């Protein structure tokens, strides 16, 4: 459903932020640099890294066109860069000289907001590079900032836990205590929840904080009816402070990264967990979806940025409810089964399956014996392949029926893992199951069929922690 396709390890210190444009990925770090990569092959651009800041770079963001990149730093500056050649366009100094923690472009590229450690927030004219408006929150440092998709207002989050809403004239529209121990990040979904009368639009806003929670809010604003912020729900998948959150471009997914070293991907419609990713070895500090592809970037204090790719077809299946998925599979017609066989690169079996009237229900009940004896499939390799694919289909039905994320299920036992370990093939398994697998002199990987380089099993504590957290929130 989601796979790690690339790891960037060029920074010399903690990765603080990552951001996508339509063609580039930008990352910034405690090492004072910003790096730019092409999305074609994830190679670093010739004019990267970008160097100017004298202290840690906390945040970076692209203008909507992708031609300009903004970066901000502990040195009290926000810098604009030309992404095509790396040329520095402007250096904008925070009026107070305070460390700048966050920066964000408005949707129309006319303004750039910067928030600082002393609680000041500045709106800059992104064309003239001059200060347009300045304000400040009552208490705490600025840690988060997000513009509404229509650009009529923006939200800031503070270390005191307050969400503050500002209009484009820097007038405070609303302030609300959102997270007890401080806000770390916030993001708007670019897709409206619905359109109402009188031009009223509703948007989802996600916020996360030191209280280990991700909260969803519904926001509306018109000049006639004013502003309204309504709390909707809390996502409690993490067991440590949540440092980052971001919506996918289509608004269908929400991702969060945490001090517990995990990344969680949620379905925004059902709020179910789709994936828990546990590859980072230290705090996950940032996460971002690409605007036009099914790519996700996650950055960490382990100095790396991981690039993940989603499978659209499988992802759509994962969003089905238990009844819908079961009904969908069991109600497959013979033609549906033929289509599935072709998709699995098993088109040679279409004729045999049609001749034997194999529909969805019969497909799920096929066994090793029935493939050989009843369907007369002579090739052992072909029988093994189709059986593997059917088992994958059964597993999806079973895991999604129970609501268990795929990453929590042992590939050998097909059950929820209690004591996950990482084998030398890089996959996680239930400890007892993998020990039994190896003790029977099966020195090949259950997942790849390649020879295991080593019999060493390493406890996957991060995954175990994520499973325990999931169990706590799903026990009835």
From Swiss-Prot:
Pfam families: SAM_2, U-box, WD40. Gene3D superfamilies: Transcription Factor, Ets-1 (1.10.150.50), YVTN repeat-like/Quinoprotein amine dehydrogenase (2.130.10.10), Zinc/RING finger domain, C3HC4 (zinc finger) (3.30.40.10). One of its GO terms (biological process) is protein ubiquitination. The keyword Phosphoprotein applies. Keywords: Phosphoprotein, Repeat, WD repeat. Residues 403-476 form the U-box domain. GO terms for molecular function: ubiquitin-protein transferase activity. WD repeats lie at residues 10-47, 52-91, 95-134, 137-176, 178-228, 237-276, 279-318. Residues 332-396 form the SAM domain. InterPro entries: G-protein_beta_WD-40_rep (IPR020472), SAM (IPR001660), SAM/pointed_sf (IPR013761), Ubox_domain (IPR003613), WD-SAM-U-box (IPR052085), WD40/YVTN_repeat-like_dom_sf (IPR015943), WD40_repeat_CS (IPR019775), WD40_repeat_dom_sf (IPR036322). The modification Phosphothreonine is found at residue 458. This is WD repeat, SAM and U-box domain-containing protein 1. The gene is WDSUB1.
């Amino acid at each position: 459903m989601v796979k790690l396709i690339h790891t960037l390890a060029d920074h010399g210190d903690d990765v603080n932020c990552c951001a996508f444009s339509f063609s580039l990925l930008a990352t910034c770090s405690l090492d004072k640099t910003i790096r730019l990569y092409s999305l074609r092959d994830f190679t670093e651009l010739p004019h990267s890294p970008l160097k100017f800041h004298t202290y840690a770079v906390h945040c970076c963001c692209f203008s909507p066109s992708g031609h300009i990149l903004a970066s901000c730093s502990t040195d009290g500056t926000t810098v604009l860069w030309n992404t095509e050649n790396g040329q520095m366009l402007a250096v904008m100094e925070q009026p107070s000289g305070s460390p700048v923690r966050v920066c964000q472009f408005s949707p129309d590229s006319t303004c750039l907001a910067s928030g600082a450690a002393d609680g000041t927030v500045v709106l800059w004219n992104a064309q003239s590079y001059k200060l347009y408006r300045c304000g400040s929150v009552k208490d705490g440092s600025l840690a988060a900032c997000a513009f509404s998709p229509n650009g009529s207002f923006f939200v800031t989050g503070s270390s005191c836990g307050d969400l503050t809403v500002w209009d484009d004239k820097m007038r405070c529209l609303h302030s609300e205590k959102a997270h007890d121990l401080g806000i770390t990040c916030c993001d708007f979904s670019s897709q409206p929840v619905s359109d109402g009368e009188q031009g009223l639009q509703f948007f989802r806003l996600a916020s996360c904080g030191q209280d280990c929670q991700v909260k969803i809010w519904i926001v509306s604003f018109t000049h006639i009816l004013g502003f309204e912020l309504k709390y909707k729900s809390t996502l409690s998948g993490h067991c440590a402070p949540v440092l980052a959150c971001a919506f996918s471009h289509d608004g269908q997914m929400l991702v969060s990264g945490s001090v517990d070293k995990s990344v969680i991907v949620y379905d925004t419609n059902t709020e179910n967990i789709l994936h828990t990713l546990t590859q980072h070895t230290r705090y996950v500090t940032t996460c971002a979806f690409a605007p036009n592809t099914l790519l996700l970037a996650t950055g960490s204090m382990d100095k790396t940025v991981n690039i993940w790719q989603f499978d659209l077809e499988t992802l759509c299946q994962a969003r089905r409810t238990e009844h819908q998925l079961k009904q969908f599979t069991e109600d497959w017609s013979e033609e549906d089964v033929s289509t599935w066989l072709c998709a699995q690169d098993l088109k040679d079996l279409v004729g045999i399956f049609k001749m034997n009237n194999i529909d969805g229900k019969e497909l799920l009940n096929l066994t090793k014996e029935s493939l050989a004896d009843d369907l007369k499939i002579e090739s052992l390799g072909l029988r093994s392949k189709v059986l593997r694919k059917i088992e994958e289909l059964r597993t999806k039905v079973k895991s999604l029926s129970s609501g268990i994320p795929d990453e929590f299920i042992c590939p050998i036992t097909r059950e929820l893992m209690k004591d996950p370990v990482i084998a030398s093939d890089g996959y996680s398994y239930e400890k007892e199951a993998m020990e039994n697998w190896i003790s029977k002199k099966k020195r090949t990987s259950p997942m790849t069929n390649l020879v295991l380089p080593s019999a060493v099993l390493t406890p996957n504590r991060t995954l175990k922690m994520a499973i325990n957290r999931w169990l706590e929130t799903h026990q009835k």
